[in-house]
Amino acid sequence: MTNDYIVKALAFGGQIRAYSALTTESVQEAQTRHYTWPTASAALGRTMTATLMMGAMLKGNQKLTVTVDGQGPIGKVIADADAKGNVRGYVTNPQTHFPLNDHGKLDVSRAVGTNGSLTVVKDVGLKDYFSGSSPLVSGELGDDFTYYFAKSEQVPSSVGLGVLVNPDNSIKASGGFLIQVMPGAEDETINKLEDAINHMTPVSKLIDQGLTPEELLFEILGEENVQILENVPAHFECNCGHDKFLNAIKGLGEAEIQNMINEDHGAEAECHFCRNKYQFSEEELQQLLDNIK
């Protein structure tokens, strides 16, 4: 069982749609699997948290993938999630770390870079995909997701993300919020929201203080204004498997498979998302080859 979960809520009589998430254990699982250093952990954790909350907007078997590519030293940050609270992610260069920035925080912007884009691909079923992209504005990721919603999905939003890392590289706290203004929202509501967000304590500090996702929303929106709709358990989950990789090997073609048999006497594949390794024997590859022929 995981302690991580996502909260879905409405506020101010439906003028505001809100999500918040506690992701400490999910991000710890990613940190353990990928051996990420603190700055990389923060970048990956923030991206996973945002992706998880975006996944909570989906239905049924729909899923989405987020790719952040700012041309920075960390390379790409990739996460995907579904409507059921499953999330996974990885970074190209997990051993990326820098001294704290001028604000005494992990320098995520320096690791991610700002010369690039945030891309979202939603798999909405029936081989139907929605793709949206926006330029990175700060590389800190919260601002970048906020800008993505405004630019690509035309929904005024505020995204706050935070990850705190312990001296031993383990994850101390991780979570975030995603608040969206619905069509027809009153100016007074929008002004209240902007004022609250501008004056709030950083997300990672609030989570570190023990605030639950519900309390995080109460802090921003006022408890009396919030209607909690649903809680969804969240966890790091990878859907890779032996058969999936065997299928991928099949796609390489006969010559490449024959090469694996002759030269390597088998094959090994590693999943980018969870680093599980899969072994394929000569016999298995030969059988695959026979089936293709």
UniProtKB/Swiss-Prot annotation:
One of its GO terms (cellular component) is cytoplasm. Pfam families: HSP33. Under oxidizing conditions two disulfide bonds are formed involving the reactive cysteines. Under reducing conditions zinc is bound to the reactive cysteines and the protein is inactive. Disulfide bonds join 238-240, 271-274. SUPFAM superfamilies: Hsp33 domain, HSP33 redox switch-like. One of its GO terms (molecular function) is unfolded protein binding. Keywords: Chaperone, Cytoplasm, Disulfide bond, Redox-active center, Zinc. GO terms for biological process: protein refolding. InterPro entries: Heat_shock_Hsp33 (IPR000397), Heat_shock_Hsp33_C (IPR016154), Heat_shock_Hsp33_N (IPR016153). The keyword Disulfide bond applies. Redox regulated molecular chaperone. Protects both thermally unfolding and oxidatively damaged proteins from irreversible aggregation. Plays an important role in the bacterial defense system toward oxidative stress. Belongs to the HSP33 family. HAMAP family: HslO. This is 33 kDa chaperonin. It comes from Staphylococcus saprophyticus subsp. saprophyticus (strain ATCC 15305 / DSM 20229 / NCIMB 8711 / NCTC 7292 / S-41). The gene is hslO.
